[in-house]
Amino acid sequence: MPLVSQDLLTIMHRPDVNELSLQTVAEFYETYLCGHQYYYELRHKQRELRLRFKKGDLCHLLGIQHVLNGSDNVGETGFVKLKNGENTFVSLEKANKGGYLNMLYRMLYFPFVYQLIHAPHVVTNTVNQTGNVVKAQFSFHNGKREHYVELKLRRESANNPDFFVPVSFSESGKNAHRASIVIQTKKILPYDEGYVAITKANVKY
């Protein structure tokens, strides 16, 4: 039976392509992840971590850019193509089978992000400025039945040093076993609470 977006809140196993659609993933992402601010008070020099999801980031997190070419398949336009059923598992496989197979597990494990942000292990990353290494200050990771998912986070802007956005999602059968930062408090806040709008007068370079 095909899964609906609400089913993805509590899934316990990696869904099959016959159970899940990218349209459902987009609906789930928009309904349960976007529009909220996930607040974590940490026992760390970065005392507050405020995570926000944006519609235009979903395609990148799923790895669509490794399967399809063209700016219309990423960002907010790409999100619309997922939500309206234009870009599907079938169409991705037809367009680029190798890229599709490389990204398939990432796409199928993505629904675990909801459970991950509600019970994360938070770790710091060494920000590498060279090559194609993702520049991310923090990661959320957790394991599901010996398979691990990781969400890497990057600061939104210098003007809002406590606000972070997801920059990369991955799944793996291995975990690096890094020491976790203690989470003292976590809660869900309105999307823009505490955010300082960037203007020409207050922008930092």
Regions found by a protein language model. Name each.
Residues 1-136, 141, 205:
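An acidic, glycine-rich, mixed-charge low-complexity segment common to nucleic-acid enzymes
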Residues 105-201:
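Conserved binding-pocket/active-site segment within a compact domain
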